[in-house]
Amino acid sequence: MDRLVIGTRRYSSWSLRGWLAVRCAGLDVPDEVIALRGGGQTSEIHAISPNGMVPYLVHQGARIWESLAICEYCAEIAPILWPADRVARAVARSVASEMHAGFRALRIAMPMNLGRTKRPLLETGDDVLADIARIDRIWCETRERFGATGPYLFGADFCIADIMFAPVVSRFTSYGVTLSPIAEAYRQTVLDHPLMREWARLAALEPTSWHLERYEALN
């Protein structure tokens, strides 16, 4: 059965990436949401997904796991998900891959939590600040170099590079991170995207029994 398996919308940053790609590509697949228990202990996901993680997409005979692989699959169906220009596309792939593989300090210190609103951490380590500075620089450089035709990193179209950074937009919002003017304008633009608003709306409908103390109590 075709489906997109995702975790708790409130917390699952990788699920958000896969979901955005699937929706942007116009794939007609239902969401199957599994409440996360944290720490890789969600047995229902292990029973379904080949790598025991979300997102996991089943579509017309294809079975795809890992967010970036799902994004690439969606781009084969909807090529607009990558910039048309060769140079811009190369840079978009580079920053998307950097986001997929890097920024570990930020991920650990500021896990995605859509229920947290502009509440900074009591302490922010130098490694986290370095990650924030690098992301700010990526956003500014791509906007200045490729963003003349629209509000996103590579212009008018919301592409995979934007999708990969979408959970970071949520993190920066939740933890009240201060950004440069260009990066701040981009953060607000992505936050206002209709699909981001829809994800937030659906997250707000999840039962409170799905909330995890390890994220809710983070200071």
Predicted regions and their residues:
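A short, structure-level motif marking secondary-structure boundaries and short turns
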Residues: 2-5, 56, 154, 171-172, ...
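Conserved beta-strand edge residues that scaffold enzyme active sites
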Residues: 35-38, 186, 204
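Acidic/histidine-enriched, glycine/proline-rich intrinsically disordered or flexible terminal extensions
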Residues: 203-219
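Short Asp/Glu-rich motifs
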Residues: 41-42, 191, 209-210
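GST-like fold's C-terminal all-alpha helical module
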Residues: 103-192
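GST-like domain detector, emphasizing the conserved glutathione-binding G-site
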Residues: 1-125, 129
